[in-house]
């Protein structure tokens, strides 16, 4: 099931060139960060820990490694939504009920609920700058969790 997303105003994306350009740059910067963390898991761990994480250093490194395994390699490019995964997620969200018997979605998402247009433009920018957006050579690192995650 797909998780996490970046949300934007569809009407503004379609009608406001500056808004769309900002969205493309924002997505490109986000994806560049994920590519950096793919190649520099320890440095990303250090950034998070230095910012005051309540979780310890080894736990943060383990978590970064696990997230990287979910993202990489990204055959279509990092951030591109696979339509089959989207359809599966929408179906689960309409059918799976919580303890109160409610679902996350009460009807199918509109046709414009997601787009790969922005991410594809962002990927083109990153590829032009030499950023590896697919991570075909990614291999997870070995992480040893310390007691208490420290």
Q: Can you say where each PLM-predicted feature lies in the sequence?
A:
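A bilobed periplasmic-binding-protein/Venus flytrap-type ligand-binding module shared by bacterial periplasmic
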Residues: 2-20
